[in-house]
């Protein structure tokens, strides 16, 4: 089990993040009852004080709400993300602990360059690319790192 071994999400972190990303308290305009249920769901799903990315996605799916709403509640509660499906927020971002490939597959590289040139290199677009190419998000993220491309627009609002 992965331990969320990071410090608490504090006011300094919140200020830094909000200078880059403005989600607002309720970006999906959810009714107060739904927000209360969402807060409870996030609290109940915490693993060692953090919310695993796939669990955040599942909460959104189960509640039929946008993923960004889960991220906004996480910010409000001061909860950090763990287990990002693209490998962000880890020291070792490669899925291969011993010998990481030094070049991206031509198909993944072409897809990433196409997204980058269209200014659409986002988390959602990367997941669509993984479905289209029948690969994993980590492989696509690793290829982006190899190519020096930056993925943005986290569906939970983390980056």
Predicted segments, located by residue:
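Long, charge-rich, low-complexity intrinsically disordered regions
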Residues: 2-159
């Amino acid at each position: 089990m992965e331990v969320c071994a990071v410090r608490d999400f504090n006011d300094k972190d919140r200020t830094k993040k909000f200078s880059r990303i403005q989600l607002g308290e309720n970006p999906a305009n959810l009714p107060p009852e739904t927000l209360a249920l969402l807060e409870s769901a996030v609290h109940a799903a915490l693993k060692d004080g953090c919310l695993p990315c796939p669990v955040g996605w599942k909460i959104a799916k189960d509640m039929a709400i946008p993923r960004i709403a889960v991220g906004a509640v996480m910010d409000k509660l001061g909860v950090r993300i763990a287990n990002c499906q693209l490998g962000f927020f880890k020291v070792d971002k490669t899925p291969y602990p011993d010998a990481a490939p030094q070049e991206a597959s031509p198909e993944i590289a072409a897809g990433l360059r196409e997204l980058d040139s269209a200014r659409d290199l986002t988390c959602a677009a990367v997941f669509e690319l993984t479905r289209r190419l029948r690969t994993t998000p980590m492989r696509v993220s690793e290829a982006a790192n190899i190519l020096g491309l930056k993925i943005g627009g986290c569906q939970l609002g983390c980056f």
